[in-house]
Amino acid sequence: NLASLNLIKFSKKNKKLDINAFEHACRLWTLTLEISVMMAQFPSKEIAQKSFDYRTLGLGYANIGGLLMSWGVPYDSDEGRAICSSISAIMTGISYATSAEIAKELGPFSKYKLNSKDMLRVIRNHKRAADGFKDGYDSLTINPVPLIKEDCPSEDLPNAASKAWEKALKDGEKFGYRNAQTTVIAPTGTIGLVMDCDTTGIEPDFAMVKFKKLAGGGYFKIINQVVP
């Protein structure tokens, strides 16, 4: 029950991301993955039952390394981390907000009442991190690293992240959530190639030219297309 978005497809000039298109894609794929819960096949009855009880989804992205390369931003830099944090926050915030919208129509996941207090606490902590606060988190022994807005190349990304989590919390308090979990960053080692990604998952590229070993024997060459 996984889906990944190729971030380079949302890239614009001057280190800009097409936020409206990205948010629309996150909403669309959250709904698609929610529908797929009832269509999926599971390896055991226990896994199937938990999937129906919690309706967990796996929306993610790939090619963050390629995106940063195309923008000329070092992967291991404050700016790179702020961009990645903002994109991750937008994706997860929009996905939970969409989940709350679905819950308004179809009801929350069946185990939500047993977990509502803790889940809303998690959402509030996520919102606080997206807003850039270093402390004030609820029932955490180790505070998360917040989104540092000043390190982003523009205010658009962190502002969108903050708005996404504000909506996720506001709607979730009213309607609950259709899904206990909505996002995950998968390795995308295979589908990333089909999606024309230069880097898979969340990792940077380790070489401009690579050779992938095939299970049936042989190799094929992979060339990073971000760098001309």
Question: PLM features: what roles do these ranges have?
Answer:
Residues N1-P228:
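Long, C-terminal-biased catalytic regions of enzyme "large/alpha" subunits
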